[in-house]
Amino acid sequence: MVPFEYYVALSGLLMVLGFIGVIIRKNIIAMLLSTELMLNAVNIAFVAFDMKLHDVVGQVFVFFILTIAAAEAAIGLGLIIAIYRMKKDVDVEKLTELKG
């Protein structure tokens, strides 16, 4: 069986990679994917601590987070498509105005 610390290290690494992706990327789609990566890192951490503590609460939180992540992805992609139809670009630096 894989040790608990490996799961926590993997979770931390994925969280850092997702955070760097949100900070560095200029494309909204890449930023959305990086956010999803961070949410999955949290899921791995919840399951790892759930294994360590022998409790089911972590798995329940994972189901809630997956539901929220799916809704976030659907709404985010809808907004990105609407922005692309109006501006013909999804680069964050070119999207400076919030009014239509």
Swiss-Prot record:
UniProt membrane topology term: Multi-pass membrane protein
Chain ranges passing through the membrane: 4-24, 28-48, 61-81
Enzyme kind, highest EC tier: translocase
Reaction(s) the record says it catalyses: a quinone + NADH + 5 H(+)(in) = a quinol + NAD(+) + 4 H(+)(out)
NCBIfam families in alphabetical order: PRK05715.1-2, PRK05715.1-3, PRK05715.1-5
Role: NDH-1 shuttles electrons from NADH, via FMN and iron-sulfur (Fe-S) centers, to quinones in the respiratory chain. The immediate electron acceptor for the enzyme in this species is believed to be ubiquinone. Couples the redox reaction to proton translocation (for every two electrons transferred, four hydrogen ions are translocated across the cytoplasmic membrane), and thus conserves the redox energy in a proton gradient.
Family, similarity comment: Belongs to the complex I subunit 4L family.
Protein name: NADH-quinone oxidoreductase subunit K
Upper classification of the organism: Bacteria, Pseudomonadati, Aquificota, Aquificia, Aquificales
Gene: nuoK
